């Protein structure tokens, strides 16, 4: 049994933090697909490539080297992990991620990684598009207010000047765009386990997911040895 874990959910639901910890626990590769879209957004903005410039975006994606190392995203040899979390990227990433050609190119890369490695992958369309046959699918949720508060605290810890009100408005806007886009909209896979993280600590969610994965692996091993 290949261990492929899909973790989907809206911004601020705790996907990345939880996915990293689950990947570490099971010694799996962690793929932050959101970081990939953020990286493209960051690079496109720096080159003045708008979301409507499809050809420019495709040329950009095809011209770069992108990989993950120690939970960091490296693009053309440069660590962009901090740059892609800044407000100007966060407020525009959904617009770039909604471009069909952008999603097609990045989804192909993500699918290729899932074929080559056992992975924990988080995003918005992992269980529905990227890894529809993954044996482990989870959909994390939380109230917009809680998600905004988490993002606010995260950015404040990085000494970024942010306002809670602006973050909440941005999250509500992103929820709408992500859920209503024509290409790979944010939605729960039919066979995904939904976990509301509003009143749970990160460690509790990781423990819940880990136990579900472990129990399935044990059952599968028992079935094979019979």
UniProtKB/Swiss-Prot annotation:
ATP binds at residues 9-17. Gene3D superfamilies: P-loop containing nucleotide triphosphate hydrolases. It is found in: Cytoplasm. Belongs to the cytidylate kinase family. Type 1 subfamily. Its EC number is 2.7.4.25. Keywords: ATP-binding, Cytoplasm, Kinase, Nucleotide-binding, Transferase. This is Cytidylate kinase. InterPro entries: Cytidylate_kin (IPR003136), Cytidylate_kinase_dom (IPR011994), P-loop_NTPase (IPR027417). The keyword Nucleotide-binding applies. GO terms for molecular function: ATP binding; CMP kinase activity; dCMP kinase activity. GO terms for cellular component: cytosol. Its main location: cytoplasm. The lineage of its organism: Bacteria, Bacillati, Bacillota, Clostridia, Eubacteriales. GO terms for biological process: nucleobase-containing small molecule interconversion; pyrimidine nucleotide metabolic process. It catalyses: CMP + ATP = CDP + ADP; dCMP + ATP = dCDP + ADP.
